[in-house]
Amino acid sequence: QVLSSAASDVYKRQGMEVNKYESQPHRPNIVGIPKGSGNGPVLMMNDHMDTYPVVEPHKWDKTNFKPFEATRVGDLLYARGSSDTRGNLACTILAAQALIEQGIKLKGDLMYCFCVDEERDGTHGSIYLTKNIGIKADYSITAEPTAYGGDATKGDWGMNLSIANGGHCLIEVTLEGDKAHIWRPDTSNNAIVESAKLISHLEIMPFTHEITEFMGHTPPCTTIVRIRGGLPGEM
């Protein structure tokens, strides 16, 4: 809510028409529009204001273990969300300011759209704005710093252009085994052991697809993100 209010205030000072759209209390999406001089196409500059949670605060030594407090170290600014996507938000705001200061008149409308829900699934952000509010644009540029670069060792991760995102799906697999005493594994079918076999198979599973001609398109992949095992109450 604080970030939404700050962005809204900046755009209002820049003379934009600003609207707030809430799907959840105290989490307004911001849409700022500097009107163009004609009936040209609409270009949306899109970004998100929510931040991925911190799960290992003890590793944030650059911020004195306070990941939500921005800390400058040399020419770098460290904080949870500094690149994903506070830095991008700042660039978008400065780009809007530059157009205004230069007195550039566009034939079409620019639309600056800052959403509150991207890290989860977009239900209360872009999806809500398009399906419930009816926000539309002819073209869109999303300042998301995770465009696929092919070789992360070259330091180009997130610094690439991508024409689209392939999307993702979450799949939960449950394996059931046969319970037995720990000294008699020969009499059981251990679901944990079987899951290890499944994971090994998923790691080498081939994907049958045609390589897209669009630059930066993320290739298909499988990522194991969580494993739970055992029965509640067991020692």
Identify the residue ranges that each predicted region occupies:
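A structural supersecondary motif
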Residues: 215-235
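Active-site metal-coordination/substrate-binding segment of hydrolases
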Residues: 40-111
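Short acidic/glycine-enriched loop/turn segments that link adjacent beta-strands
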Residues: 25-28
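Conserved, helical-rich catalytic subdomain that frames metal- and/or nucleotide-binding sites
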Residues: 194, 205-215
